[in-house]
Amino acid sequence: FICLLSAPYATASLELASGITLNTLNGEVIDNVEDAVFTSGENQLVLDYTGYLSDKGKREFISTVPYIMVVNVPENADVDIDLLSRKYAKIEKNVDRELPIFSISVNGDDAEVVQEVLPPSQGALPYGDIPQLVKDYNKERGLVFDS
């Protein structure tokens, strides 16, 4: 008698456009995007962007605040994340207004994903401990994600 158990992990692949960083996945710090393992179903991501964007023929540097979001990932899915725009003015305006800045697709289809700016902590380094900010965010909202 052989009993086979399968873990509820999706063997999804994740592609991040240049400059996009995955800070945490389901509350766990991700040092290398290749190590990111999605669970089948809802996954909580914290992303930010650091790099150069086009601004009236010049290149302007921008480093965004982290955004938190939940993406529904079926098994064996391909998840692609890019910026909504490569225009500095558009991304800067959206960050200032706390509007979405990322474009997310699952298996080639645009995913409807609510993106929020991760609430900062008080003090000199408002995003110095992103995993703790995610824990606080989830606790306040009664959210639980498997890692």
Feature-to-residue mapping (PLM):
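Sec-dependent N-terminal signal peptides
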Residues: 1-2
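N-terminal signal peptide c-region/cleavage motif recognized by signal peptidases
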Residues: 5-8
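Short loop/turn and low-complexity linker motifs enriched in small/turn-promoting residues
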Residues: 11-38, 44-147
